[in-house]
Amino acid sequence: MTMRETKKDIIVYYHADCMDGAGAAWAARQKFGDAAEYAPVNYNYKSEDLFCVRGKEVYVLDFSFPRTVLEIWIKQAKSLLVLDHHASAKDNLTGLPYAVFDMNKSGAMMAWEGFHPGTEAPMVIKHIQDRDLWKFELPGTRELSAYMRTRSASMDTVGFVYLNERAGEKAMGVLYGLGEAILDHIQAQVTEATSRAFKAWLRGTEVLCTTCCSDIASEVGSALAKLSPSKIGVIVSLSHRGAGLSIRSDGGTGARDLAEKCGGGGHGPAAGGYLNREEFFELMHTATPFTPA
């Protein structure tokens, strides 16, 4: 196994391409600053994406590695802590004292509370949690989330919003206003993406699939799930390695169950998986047109 080396004593792994993961990493950076190595990681990671953990202080945020990997790392690292909230990972890591789960909080909120105990979370973290748990209970969450999705899912984006938060209500009001204007455009994109949906068989389940940019995957997936006879919608994202899958179900645990069959996991109604190139071609061989009823 080929892994990268770092001179830093702290390694922070976090869920890549995810605003919740970025928020968790930002919370860690507020504590460790440049003393830590921040490494985004996804379920289709390769060994060369990882750092050698021997003698390091290791944190895994809004993400979990397989149990076999963590059981090796705990013997090599100076310390190891996993903070996650994905149901499939919780089931797989049951009994590991260094793996902490809270299904009622997002990864960003868990990281903030873990690294800054007793300090109220910034609004940007509260908004990230509100969307990640798909609650939308806070005023402005939809608008701010829409604005943030025009930027990369990164620590810098979270930090930029935090600076506006510190600047006061007027500065945040500008971001909310921009987000409100963006929401109409997002809905148009969702409508366009769902209009291209097709049926396909994925691990024995007939699902509705389409492609779209990752920024609107949750909205499109949820829309597909409502249209799908199996109540499952899948967003396919292609790369040179294969296809990433954002899976959504209209209630229940269908998304998570299917994601686990695709090497991933997540929550009951929202999860992610992966297909290599050969598996993706097999999926496409089963594709048929879809016409909404």
Outline where the language-model segments fall.
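Structural motif
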Residues: 15-16, 61-63, 210-214
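Short alpha-helices
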Residues: 87-156
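Gly/His-enriched, cation/cofactor- and phosphate-binding structural elements
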Residues: 4-10, 56, 184-293
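Glycine-rich, Lys/Arg-enriched anion-binding loops that position phosphate/diphosphate groups
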Residues: 133-217
